[in-house]
């Protein structure tokens, strides 16, 4: 089993984001995970600052450490509509340096609220063993998510065919969204499986939040505004029990052990914005 990580998984250099300043303490050293050492940033959360600094950019230190931008701040290059070669028009746009989902109004939905006519935005590339950081905000009562370890083949074979099948980092207006009744459905959760812990602090609808996912081997973590709020390990009794009670229980058996896949921005037919999407592959 991978060891518990003890550092914030944010890229190098000072970042004024999501109501907190990330200040670099070190940009090299052991990760605390099994399987050898790796370069990594170590940061400290300081006083609140503007969320608008250095969006969609890599610092020199980040670039040197191997971080990559998955969104250039101007185009949807590197992304396509799930199940399509490109992106059907009118659903996803770039607006003011952010990827925005354009709300179309309530249509037919699945029991979990997933629109039957929506189209998720999926990365062209797939990833294994990574740290992913991004900023996001939702409109009032908004609901969305970022999915990872997604199989496009499995996704298009199941209904709805343009909605991703993968682990979901929940993004939600915890105060007013309809799907706020269960702790495992609130912001920061591994959706329908693990609720965020007591360290969680969330900015309200319309304000930027900063999130990160760490996924290596069997080990996964969700971070929200500088705090680790979810931690899990594939194949453990705790994980298998949560999986068996979740909406994923009807998926193929191999889904529960999947360790690689695409990154997906969810179309939940609400207005949601993503920016500063950065990934570091652990090699």
Predicted regions: what they are:
Residues 2-16:
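Bacterial N-terminal signal peptides that target proteins for export
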Residues 4, 18-20, 30, 42:
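Short stretches within intrinsically disordered, low-complexity N-terminal or propeptide regions
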Residues 14-26:
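Bacterial N-terminal signal peptides
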Residues 27-283:
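Carbohydrate-interacting regions of secretory-pathway proteins
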């Amino acid at each position: 089993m991978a060891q518990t990580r003890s550092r914030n998984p944010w890229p190098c250099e000072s970042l004024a984001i999501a109501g907190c300043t990330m200040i670099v303490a070190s940009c090299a050293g052991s990760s605390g995970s099994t399987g050898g050492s790796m370069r990594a940033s170590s940061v400290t959360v300081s006083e609140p600052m503007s969320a608008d600094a250095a969006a969609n950019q890599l610092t020199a230190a980040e670039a040197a450490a191997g971080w990559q931008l998955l969104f250039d701040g101007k185009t949807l290059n590197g992304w396509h509509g799930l199940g399509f070669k490109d992106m059907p028009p009118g659903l996803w746009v770039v607006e003011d340096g952010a990827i925005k989902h354009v709300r179309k109004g309530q249509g037919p939905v699945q029991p979990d609220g997933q629109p039957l006519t929506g189209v998720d935005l999926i990365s062209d590339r797939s990833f294994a063993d990574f740290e992913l950081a991004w900023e996001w905000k939702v409109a009032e009562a908004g609901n969305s998510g970022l999915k990872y370890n997604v199989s496009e083949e499995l996704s298009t074979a199941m209904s709805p065919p343009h909605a991703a099948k993968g682990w979901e980092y929940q993004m939600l207006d915890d105060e007013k969204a309809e799907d706020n009744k269960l702790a495992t459905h609130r912001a920061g959760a591994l959706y329908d499986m693990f609720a965020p812990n007591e360290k969680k602090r969330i900015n309200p609808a319309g304000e930027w939040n900063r999130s990160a996912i760490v996924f290596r081997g069997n080990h996964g973590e969700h971070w929200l505004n500088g705090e680790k709020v979810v931690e899990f390990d594939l194949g453990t009794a705790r994980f298998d029990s949560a999986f068996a009670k979740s909406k994923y229980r009807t998926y193929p058996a191999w889904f529960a052990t999947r360790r690689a896949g695409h990154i997906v921005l969810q179309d939940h037919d609400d207005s949601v914005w993503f920016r500063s999407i950065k990934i570091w592959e652990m090699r």
